[in-house]
């Protein structure tokens, strides 16, 4: 099934590139169609009754991801501010973050 979906996506890209040579437009259309398919599959897999219930579940998941990202960024900035200036000067500013 996965091979079939991949081959269909390849054909979609080929046909859309043939119709519109602008690759960004074609890629955006293909990936938005794929996203829509994945969303519908997720709704069916979750067994949610309506699109509204599914959208609320997705919003909660996105909020959790945003919170985690903000916490990680805050930790990185805190460690960056605490580090000596000589240590800050390298190209790996956020890579050498001290773990607590």
UniProtKB/Swiss-Prot annotation:
Record keywords, A-Z: Signal
Keyword Signal in annotation: yes
Signal sequence segment: 1-26
Protein name in UniProt: Uncharacterized protein YwcI
Organism: Bacillus subtilis (strain 168)
């Amino acid at each position: 099934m996965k091979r079939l979906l991949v081959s269909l996506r390849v054909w979609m890209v080929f046909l859309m590139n043939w119709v519109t040579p602008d690759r960004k437009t074609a890629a955006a259309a293909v990936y938005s169609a794929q996203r829509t398919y994945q969303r519908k599959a997720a709704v069916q897999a979750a067994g949610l009754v309506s699109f509204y219930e599914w959208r609320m579940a997705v919003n909660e998941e996105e909020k959790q991801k945003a919170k985690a990202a903000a916490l990680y960024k805050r930790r990185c900035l805190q460690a960056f501010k605490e580090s000596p200036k000589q240590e800050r000067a390298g190209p790996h500013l956020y890579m050498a973050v001290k773990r607590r």
